[in-house]
């Protein structure tokens, strides 16, 4: 294993801490969360809300890497007008490059996102995180972010995650 390449990949991944979420920037959120903060939020939801029939460890791994490709392609949102297939191809190419030089193969985790029971659960937690963050920013900064909540609700199945996303207002922060 080449330690110089491994070190480069580890350092590059840390840049997710500085990459702001594009949707929040577009809406004028002050000090928007980073992609890394979002990934932590998704992992937190997976850890706390994981049902018994889902492999928690696998779901956590998927949650941690689900937006890793954004290091190279940026945080592409539906408002950017990028064809979803083109976005997926860009992200796959970026992820493949980022996966080289690591002591573990991360490709199965990114391929599972949305495509296995664990991956679908993580994707649902991704939408829940967006809705909860919209509620939080709306309460703290007085912004109208209902479109983010509505987008999440449109993609969430009935049940606990949808109920949490639909919350009328967050508790006192």
Show the residue positions of the predicted features.
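Active-site helical microenvironments for divalent-metal-assisted chemistry
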Residues: 1-173
């Amino acid at each position: 294993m080449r330690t110089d390449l491994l070190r480069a990949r580890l350092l590059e991944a840390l840049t997710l801490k500085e990459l702001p979420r594009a949707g929040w920037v577009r809406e004028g959120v002050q000090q928007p969360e980073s992609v890394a903060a979002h990934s932590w939020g998704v992992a937190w939801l997976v850890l706390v809300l994981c049902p018994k029939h889902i492999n928690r460890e696998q779901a956590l791994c998927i949650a941690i890497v689900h937006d890793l490709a954004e290091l190279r392609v940026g945080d592409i949102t539906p408002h950017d007008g990028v064809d979803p297939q083109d976005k997926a191809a860009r992200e796959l190419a970026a992820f493949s490059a980022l996966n080289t030089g690591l002591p573990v193969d991360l490709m199965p985790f990114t391929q599972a996102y949305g495509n296995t029971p664990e991956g679908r659960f993580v994707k649902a937690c991704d939408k829940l995180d967006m809705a909860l963050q919209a509620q939080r920013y709306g309460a703290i900064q007085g912004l109208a972010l209902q479109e983010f909540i509505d987008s999440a609700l449109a993609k969430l199945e009935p049940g606990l995650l949808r109920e949490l996303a639909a919350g009328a207002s967050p508790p006192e922060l």
